[in-house]
Amino acid sequence: MTVKLGFVVAEFNRDITYMMEIEAREHAGFLDAEVADTIYVPGAYDMPLAIKKLLERGEIDAVVTIGCVIEGATQHDEIVVQHAARKIIDLSLEFGKPVALGISGPGMTRMEATERIDYAKRAVESAVKMVQRLE
């Protein structure tokens, strides 16, 4: 069975999320998974609604989130990631389907974000493994 993935990709820090998305797509192909749909959202905080829309479609087996939250002058980055992660978990449980967290941050610099591009690959791996193990 080919695992059908939905991607939700943040446009904020697009120079980094673009590279994350490319790596995620390549790894999905390596794992013989299909990226059936992709929704682009402004930022990580905006992901839950797009995730829900993908999960409502019966053909999507799992959702992979791709985002990058870089530290700023305030604690805004921590709030964004904490609330996004909490809602992502809630949606996974509500729909009974894996939603993999491919959001790097908070508390990282742009250089650290560049070094963590492989978080997207890890999220794809997690999503595919969870679908296979929950069959």
Swiss-Prot record:
UniProt protein name: 6,7-dimethyl-8-ribityllumazine synthase
- Similarity section: Belongs to the DMRL synthase family.
Q: Which CDD domains match?
A: Lumazine_synthase_archaeal (cd09211)
Q: Which UniProt keywords apply?
A: Riboflavin biosynthesis, Transferase
- Determine if Ion transport is one of this entry's keywords: no
Q: Where does (2S)-2-hydroxy-3-oxobutyl phosphate bind?
A: 73-74, 116
- What would be one Pfam family of this protein? DMRL_synthase
Q: Which residues bind 5-amino-6-(D-ribitylamino)uracil per the record?
A: 12, 44-46, 68-70, 101
Which pathway does this chain act in? Cofactor biosynthesis; riboflavin biosynthesis; riboflavin from 2-hydroxy-3-oxobutyl phosphate and 5-amino-6-(D-ribitylamino)uracil: step 1/2
For this record, an example GO cellular component is:
riboflavin synthase complex
Top-rank taxon of the source lineage equals Archaea
Describe its function. Answer: Catalyzes the formation of 6,7-dimethyl-8-ribityllumazine by condensation of 5-amino-6-(D-ribitylamino)uracil with 3,4-dihydroxy-2-butanone 4-phosphate. This is the penultimate step in the biosynthesis of riboflavin.
What reaction(s) does this enzyme catalyze?
(2S)-2-hydroxy-3-oxobutyl phosphate + 5-amino-6-(D-ribitylamino)uracil = 6,7-dimethyl-8-(1-D-ribityl)lumazine + phosphate + 2 H2O + H(+)
Q: What class of enzyme is it?
A: transferase
According to the UniProt entry, its GO molecular function terms are: 6,7-dimethyl-8-ribityllumazine synthase activity
Q: Quote the EC number.
A: 2.5.1.78
Checking NCBIfam families in the record gives:
lumazine-synth
